[in-house]
Swiss-Prot record:
It catalyses: (4R,5S)-dethiobiotin + (sulfur carrier)-SH + 2 reduced [2Fe-2S]-[ferredoxin] + 2 S-adenosyl-L-methionine = (sulfur carrier)-H + biotin + 2 5'-deoxyadenosine + 2 L-methionine + 2 oxidized [2Fe-2S]-[ferredoxin]. This is Biotin synthase. [2Fe-2S] cluster binds at residues 115, 147, 207, 277. GO terms for biological process: biotin biosynthetic process. GO terms for molecular function: 2 iron, 2 sulfur cluster binding; 4 iron, 4 sulfur cluster binding; biotin synthase activity; iron ion binding.
Amino acid sequence: MKQVQTKRDWKKLAYDVVEEKMITKEDAIAILEADDTEVLEIMNAAYIIRHHHFGKKVKLNMIINTKSGLCPEDCGYCSQSIISEAPIDKYAWLTQEKIVEGAHEAIRRKAGTYCIVASGRRPTNKEVNHVIGAVKEIRETTDLKICCCLGFLNEDQAGQLAEAGVHRYNHNLNTHANNYDSICSTHTYDDRVDTVQKAKQAGISPCSGAIFGMGETIEQRAEIAFELQRLDADSIPCNFLVAVKGTPLEGQKELTPVECLKVLAMMRFVNPTKEIRISGGRELNLRSVQPLGLFAANSIFVGDYLTTAGQEPTADWGMIEDLGFEIEECAL
C-alpha cells in the first residue's frame, strides 16, 4: 500500500516561529515538498510571520545598471558574462550625473532603496571613488537608502563605501556551495561569502540571496536559507532563474509558480525577521500568482532589472493596493 503522508499543521509551525522557535531543516524541506494543494495554507502561515514583523508594509527597491556586460566572469546564468551570447546592451560606467538622476527616478517610482549595480569581478579604487561621488550627492539631496552591488570588495573599499553613507551591499550566494562549480569556474562560493562578511565588518548592512532553479536539489534550497541565516543577511533577494537565450543555462527548465511560492514561504519561515525580496524572474516565473508572493515576502523591485524587463511601476503599485498592503515610505 502507498504510504499516506501526514499533513503538517503549517499554522502551528508559523506561531512557533513567531514565538522565536526556529524551524529545522526537515521542516524547511517539508514546505518545499508539500503537495501543491497545500500552497494556500502554507502562504497563509507564512503571512502570520510576515505580518508579525512587517505588518502590511511593502518595501520598493529600484536598480540602476551603471555598467552593463563586459564581465570577465563565466557565470552560466548571466547574460553579462564573458561567455554569454545574449544580445544585451554593453556599456562602460554611467556618469555620476546619470547615477544621481536615477535616484530621483527611484523616488518617482516610490522606491525607498536605490540599488547601484555594476558588472565585473571587482571594482578598481577609481571606480569605487566614482560611485562614492554619486552616493554623496544622493545622500545630500534625498532620503533614499543606498545599496551597492559592485562585485568583490577588499576591506578598504568596504570601509570607504560605509563612510560615504552606503547603507547596504548586495552580493548574492547565487546557489548552494555544492552546486557552485556547475554554474561558475572563475571564482568560488567562498569568495562570495568573504565579500558578504567584509561588507558586514565595515558596518554595511549585508544583502545576500540566491537564484533558484539552477539545478539545485530541494535539500540544497533549504540549506541555502539556513546559510543566509548563518550569515545574518539583513535583506534576502529571492531570484528565480530566467533562462536567457545565449547563456549556458538557456535550456534549464524554469520553476513553476507554485514552486516559487514555496521557496518564498520557506525563506520566511527560516529567516522570519529579515527583508525577503521577490527579485529577478518575479514576473516571468510567478506570473498570475505574483500577489500571493507578498504573503511571504515584504519587498520587491519596481521597474526593470539588470538586463530583463520588469512590469510598469503602476502595475506594482496597483498590486500592492489591491492586496490591502501599503508601500513603505522612503525614509532612513
